[in-house]
Amino acid sequence: MSDPVIKRALVSVSDKTGIVEFCRELSGMGVEIFSTGGTLKSLQDSGVSASSISTITGFPEIMDGRVKTLHPKIHGGLLAVRENPEHVKQATENGISFIDLVVVNLYPFEATVARPDVTFEDAIENIDIGGPSMLRSAAKNNESVTVVTDSADYALVLQEMREHNGATKRTTRLTLALKVFELTSRYDRAIASYLAGAVAGEQQGAASKMTVTLERELDMRYGENPHQSAGLYRLTDENGTRSFGDFFEKLHGKELSYNNMLDIAAAVSLIEEFRGEEPTVVIVKHTNPCGVAQAPTLAEAYRRAFSTDTQAPFGGIISFNRPLDMEAAKAVNEIFTEILIAPAFEDGVLEMLMKKKDRRLVLQTNALPKGGWEFKSTPFGMLVQERDSKIVAKEDLTVVTKRQPTEEEIADLMFAWKICKHIKSNTILYVKNRQTYGVGAGQMSRVDSSKIARWKASEVSLDLHGSVVASDAFFPFADGLLAAAEAGVTAVIQPGGSIRDNEVIEAADANNLAMVFTGMRHFKH
């Protein structure tokens, strides 16, 4: 069959970007336009000739607009096969006219449920019924009907209509139909995820079923290694939709890689532990923090974080909890770093940093969401757990030794505990004056992690006397604690819970250490 000429269009959009201009062009080509509610008003107010959908259905919009396009004269006009004589006969007998073009986008359900103040009633009212129905009918009959869901496609449709005497090409109609089913499937999954979250709110633990939608946001050259394909996907689950662009904007530098994304997630997750606190700097390498410090100025915090490990920061990722000022930027600029992440860049800083073309500069535009689910793929299924976002306050600490920690020790212990949960297990972390002094990460033995942390401190001549130590899980034996005491530690923070806790406490008392239990483990695999 020849490509059908577009004579009648049905237009109903929530996102009115470019719709007036598009419909004005359609009208100029002789297309008869029918519309609904706010879209009709926008067109008529702009002087575009358009009629109410009620002139087709002979029925008013009712129930606060919930019922307006669910009618045989609409769906018959969309679904009728033009080459089928029986369809044409039935359409004629029932006063149904063909509709050649459908321009519809859906109620903004995902944006609505992403609002922190959204109510269940608001969410339900933003579930579109008529829109998906029209889109699916039009897309099913793509032999005859052109269907548009995205304002970015308006120009393509107009161009083809001009070049083909008012018609669109078959390949274009098929491509646009594909976009419909991708859109409606994602839309339905978002609704199902939200409702699953509502049900889960009445339940304990993870739901028996979860609906998760992944939509590619960014292509990547490769994954962790050049032989691995990769991409970044926008994720929609019961907590709404999350994407890189919701929280970050790359201002300068090469495209972000798979490994860059992992490091950004690690660096920002840690720096947000210190949101609103004194100037803090986090340096990350291969997702592990290699230096973290607080100080009166950002520049001083950076220098102190860098002094923890003066080799690892080269090619690393640095995040800041304050706008990056010129003094700190000049200090950072002395070495090559892959990525700098800040909530803002003060005047002149970007211009200076952009002189190194390969360095990525990333603006954090919003805080990362707290809580929700964390997904980890395995060859045999998907592991799902709550994010490790619970906070331990000073009031939650239980002092288990004879000696109480001093206020200065408590400040260092709390600082260390915030960092500890962001380091790969087994973790031993030494901290002094709100600066990491030795990081022992990712070892199979807690004793080995302790040895590495002490060795790293000695490599840069950091004196551990007067420091505190944090362990992400309990000390199974007293040996790890005794090694810390030998290094000069005065206070310890750990979850507790070992069957040998009493032995560890006795060892702490024997060495005049103050030790607190958090009652919360922070394994990180």
Curated annotation (Swiss-Prot):
Pathway(s) annotated for this protein in UniProt: Purine metabolism; IMP biosynthesis via de novo pathway; 5-formamido-1-(5-phospho-D-ribosyl)imidazole-4-carboxamide from 5-amino-1-(5-phospho-D-ribosyl)imidazole-4-carboxamide (10-formyl THF route): step 1/1; Purine metabolism; IMP biosynthesis via de novo pathway; IMP from 5-formamido-1-(5-phospho-D-ribosyl)imidazole-4-carboxamide: step 1/1
HAMAP family: PurH
Organism in which the protein naturally occurs: Pelodictyon phaeoclathratiforme (strain DSM 5477 / BU-1)
Protein name per its UniProtKB record: Bifunctional purine biosynthesis protein PurH
Molecular functions (GO terms): IMP cyclohydrolase activity; phosphoribosylaminoimidazolecarboxamide formyltransferase activity
PANTHER family cross-referenced by the UniProt entry: BIFUNCTIONAL PURINE BIOSYNTHESIS PROTEIN ATIC, BIFUNCTIONAL PURINE BIOSYNTHESIS PROTEIN PURH
Domain notes: The IMP cyclohydrolase activity resides in the N-terminal region.
GO terms under cellular component: cytosol
